Amino acid sequence: MHDAVTRPTPPADATAWPRRITQAVKIGSVTVGGGHPVVVQSMTNTDTADIAGSVKQVADLWRAGSEMVRLTVNNAESAAAIPRIVDKLRMMGIEVPLIGDFHYNGHQLLAAEPACAEALAKYRINPGNVGFGKKKDLQFGQLIEFAIKYGKPVRIGANWGSLDQSLAAQLMDENSQRDTPWDAGRVLREALIRSAVDSAERAVELGLPRERIILSAKVSGVQELIAVYRDMASRCDFALHLGLTEAGIGSKGIVASAAALSVLLQEGIGDTIRISLTPEPGQSRTQEVVVAQELLQTTGQRAFTPMVTACPGCGRTTSEFFQELAGVVQNHVRAKMPEWKITNPGAENMTLAVMGCVVNGPGESRHANIGISLPGTGEAPSAPVFIDGEKSVTLRGENIAYEFIELIDQYVERTYVRRAG
């Protein structure tokens, strides 16, 4: 096995641990690991054979900020659709790397559809169901041969819902011989890690370069995920994909993902993430991308859009106007960010504050690049605006929202040097 990587010493100041040093994996135009920024990825839930529907959803996820998108490739129709999906996306000016998600029959599909093998930017392989019994090594080897032939990276992703049962049984037998047997949870974690890491080392033996391998070992429990990735990170130098295998629906899924991934990211573990949310009825699939971006931004890993701080409101606030203004401001900067990213680089680092009364309003506003403190109960009907810590102007009347948005736009043009063109 490759030399293990030692966990870094925690910093004494208010920063994350140094990023774990890993292999850098090139996936289309995106680089994962090797000190590069943590990459946001997502997955479609369309029938991949539905080319129009899949193209639309990939485009939506890409526009929301997904830097890689995974699609199910589970039958001949979906495999045949992949090249056409890539072509249609390119016609739209979208060059997002597409990842093929293979289970059970990937070796057959790639053999039958060479154009699919060529069009995909990465293959996801599950060592728990790539093959069973004597066929396992053969079929795993065939998938790796395709990756080598077409120059593609792979993610070897173990999952506790489809764990290699022969390996699990072997480790259970070994555990029964210990003087002090491990509990079942520890044996399960060991099986997940061994499944991923041993499969990766086997891929290297077959000729796949280390810099074309990403690993994951997913579970649904927060503490289990943290334990698995801490252990796996100490055993190898492969880039790691983070995510709960099924985070859940609504706020539960968001909280669970944030609880697990923020700990690992704080410790420098993780090179690409996916938030596996179950969309609520009528909710956009793009929410998982927004949550992933907000998680990385709030933990200081990356900046995607200006962050808006707003107070929750209390008995001191006279209306919901400050809450409405906070929403208007957040929507405005998110809508402007694609333009600012090109013309005003650095605007994504801007901080904004929309506060509802005099208690914390002026102080919080001074901490932001631009902040506004709206009047609370019994306060004068005026709203001082602070820019870079200094009081700039006081807004009054019916046009406070419009005037504050205008101040934000002016600040961006003045502070973040506009690129020509």
Swiss-Prot record:
Binding annotation for [4Fe-4S] cluster: C311, C314, C357, E364
InterPro entries on file: Dihydropteroate_synth-like_sf, IspG_bac, IspG_bac-typ, NO2/SO3_Rdtase_4Fe4S_sf
Domain of life: Bacteria
Keywords from the named record: 4Fe-4S, Iron, Iron-sulfur, Isoprene biosynthesis, Metal-binding, Oxidoreductase
Any one GO BP annotation for this protein: isopentenyl diphosphate biosynthetic process, methylerythritol 4-phosphate pathway
Cofactor note: Binds 1 [4Fe-4S] cluster.
Pfam families: GcpE
Keyword presence, Transferase: no
Enzyme Commission code: 1.17.7.3
Catalytic reactions on record: (2E)-4-hydroxy-3-methylbut-2-enyl diphosphate + oxidized [flavodoxin] + H2O + 2 H(+) = 2-C-methyl-D-erythritol 2,4-cyclic diphosphate + reduced [flavodoxin]
Function: Converts 2C-methyl-D-erythritol 2,4-cyclodiphosphate (ME-2,4cPP) into 1-hydroxy-2-methyl-2-(E)-butenyl 4-diphosphate.
Classification via HAMAP family: IspG
Protein name: 4-hydroxy-3-methylbut-2-en-1-yl diphosphate synthase (flavodoxin)
Organism encoding this protein: Xanthomonas euvesicatoria pv. vesicatoria (strain 85-10) (Xanthomonas campestris pv. vesicatoria)
